[in-house]
Design a protein with these regions (language model features):
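Sec-dependent N-terminal signal peptides
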Residues: 4-12
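A mature extracytoplasmic/lumenal domain signature
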Residues: 6, 40, 57, 63-67, ...
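A short, Trp-centered hydrophobic/proline-enriched beta-strand micro-motif
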Residues: 26-46
Length: 183
C-alpha cells in the first residue's frame, strides 16, 4: 500500500510543474498587453500576421496575404473585416472562445484550479472547459510566455494559434481597438 501511495505522489504531483504554474500566474498578473506575430491554422489552412492583445478582452490583428484581413475586439464585439470589398462581420465576443482567452483574470482563476500537462518537455498546457468550449492554452516552459491556444471555431473546425516574437507591456495606440466602420 505504501508503494502505491509513493507511486501516486511521484507520478501525479510534480512540484516543478506547480512552481511553474505559480510563476505563470505571477507573470500574467503583471502583464497588461502582448504584441506578437502569429500563425493561425484552421483545417490545415494557415495564415500569418501580427496582433496586439490588451487585457481585458481587446485584440487587434492584421493578417498577411492578399485580402489583408483585420480582426478587432473592443471588449464587447468581435469584428472580422476583409479589404476585398470592405466587407465585415460582427459577432458578440461572448459567443466566441476569445471571450475567455482575452480575459486575463478568467485565465488566472482557471489556471489556479488546474494541473498543467507537460508537452514535449517544452510547453505547459492548461485545458479549460467552459460553456461547450474546450480551450487549450499553451505556455513556454522556459520563458513562461503564452505561446498559443487551441479551440474550435464557430463552425466546429479545429483552430490553432501559435504566437512568437512576443513583446510584453508595450505602449499601445487605443485607436487600434476601435471597431471598423463600413465604407
Amino acid at each position: 500500500m505504501l508503494r502505491i501511495i509513493i507511486f501516486i505522489i511521484l507520478n501525479f504531483y510534480n512540484p516543478a510543474l506547480t512552481s511553474m504554474k505559480e510563476d505563470i500566474i505571477s507573470k500574467m498578473q503583471i502583464t497588461n498587453n502582448l504584441s506578437f506575430n502569429f500563425t493561425h491554422t484552421i483545417d490545415e489552412k494557415s495564415e500569418n500576421g501580427m496582433c496586439i492583445l490588451e487585457y481585458p478582452k481587446k485584440i487587434y490583428c492584421e493578417y498577411d496575404g492578399a485580402n489583408k484581413k483585420i480582426i478587432v475586439s473592443n471588449g464587447r464585439s468581435l469584428v472580422i473585416k476583409t479589404n476585398n470589398g470592405n466587407n465585415y462581420y460582427i459577432y458578440p465576443l461572448d459567443r466566441t472562445p476569445l471571450e475567455y482567452i482575452l480575459d486575463k483574470e478568467y485565465l488566472i482563476s482557471k489556471i489556479k484550479m488546474l494541473e498543467p500537462r507537460s508537452i514535449d518537455n517544452k510547453y505547459l498546457n492548461f485545458q479549460i472547459f467552459e460553456n461547450n468550449n474546450e480551450i487549450n492554452i499553451f505556455f513556454d516552459k522556459k520563458s513562461l510566455n503564452l505561446v498559443g491556444w487551441q479551440t474550435e471555431d464557430i463552425y466546429q473546425n479545429l483552430s490553432v494559434t501559435f504566437i512568437s516574437s512576443i513583446r510584453i507591456n508595450q505602449k499601445i495606440d487605443q485607436k487600434k481597438f476601435k471597431l471598423p466602420q463600413n465604407n
